[in-house]
C-alpha cells in the first residue's frame, strides 16, 4: 500500500521559514514547498537542506519556489512572510506593511489550497490572522495563530531557570494578544503538579521575582530583537509552529494556547485572540474556557481591546 506523504507549504523563506523546512525534514512530517517572492532564496535554502538528507537520513522532497501555484492542494500551510522587527520597533509597527502581504497570501490560499490547515506566524500576530482569514475564507477551525505556544515556552523557561529545575516540570500558559498586553496565567501555572502559588508560599521563589518573569515574558521577543540588532527570534518560533503542526497532522489533540477565532467564548465576539485550544485532525476541535481571577480577567479584557483596536485600524 502506498502511503501518500503530507504536503506542507511554507510561505516566507526567511529565518523562520528556513528553520521550519529543516525541522519538518528532520521529523519527516511531509514534503515541503518553500515559497518566497525573492528569486533564488527559497530555491537555495531548499537545495541546501536537501543536500543534508543523506547525512541526516530523511526522505522528503523539498521544493523552493516563487510561484503560488506550487502550494496547490497543501495539507497544511505555515505563513511567516512579511518584514521582521528591528530594534526600536513594536510588533504593531509592522501592521500596514504585513497586512498587504497577508492579503495576497490569503487570496492565494483561497485559490490553491482552500482545504489546508493554516498556521500564521507573521506579526502583529492576532491582526494578521484576521487578515488571512478574511481573504482566504477558511473555516475558523482551520486557521490559527502561533503566539501562545511561544510565549508560554518563554514563561516556562524563565520560571525553570529561576527555580533551577527541569523545564519539563513546569506547566504554564499565556493568554491574550501576542504583544505587551499578553496575560501569563500565574493562577494556572504549576511545578510538577504543585500550583505555583504554593511554590511561592514555600519560599522557593518570591512573588516579586514571578512578577519580573511575567514582565520579561511580555518583552521576550524585544529582548532577542535588541540582542540580535538585525532580525528577530526564529528558533523558538519555529519550534512552536512545529508543535502545532504535529498536533494537527498526527491527530495528537494537544491543548495549546493559540490565537483562535472566538464567537462568544470568554465573552468575546468575532476576534482572533490567544486561548487554550485542542488541535487535532479537524483543526481546532475545541476552545477551552479557563476561569481567571479578577486581575487576570482585567488584563485579558485589556488585551482583547488592544487587539480589537489594532484590527479596526486596518479598516475594511
Curated annotation (Swiss-Prot):
Q: Which organism is it from?
A: Wolbachia sp. subsp. Drosophila simulans (strain wRi)
Q: Which UniProt keywords apply?
A: NAD, Oxidoreductase, Tricarboxylic acid cycle
**What's the catalysed reaction?**
(S)-malate + NAD(+) = oxaloacetate + NADH + H(+)
Q: Which GO terms describe its molecular function?
A: L-lactate dehydrogenase activity; L-malate dehydrogenase (NAD+) activity
Role of this protein: Catalyzes the reversible oxidation of malate to oxaloacetate.
Which biological processes are named by the entry's GO terms? Answer: lactate metabolic process; tricarboxylic acid cycle
InterPro entries, per the entry: L-lactate/malate_DH, Lactate/malate_DH_C, Lactate/malate_DH_N, Lactate_DH/Glyco_Ohase_4_C, Malate_DH_type3, NAD(P)-bd_dom_sf
- The record's EC number reads 1.1.1.37
| SUPFAM superfamilies assigned | LDH C-terminal domain-like, NAD(P)-binding Rossmann-fold domains
Residues bound to substrate are 85, 91, 123, 154
State the protein's name.
Malate dehydrogenase
Taxonomy, superkingdom:
Bacteria
Specify the taxonomic lineage.
Answer: Bacteria, Pseudomonadati, Pseudomonadota, Alphaproteobacteria, Rickettsiales
Record's Pfam families?
Ldh_1_C (PF02866), Ldh_1_N (PF00056)
Q: Of which family is this protein a member?
A: Belongs to the LDH/MDH superfamily. MDH type 3 family.
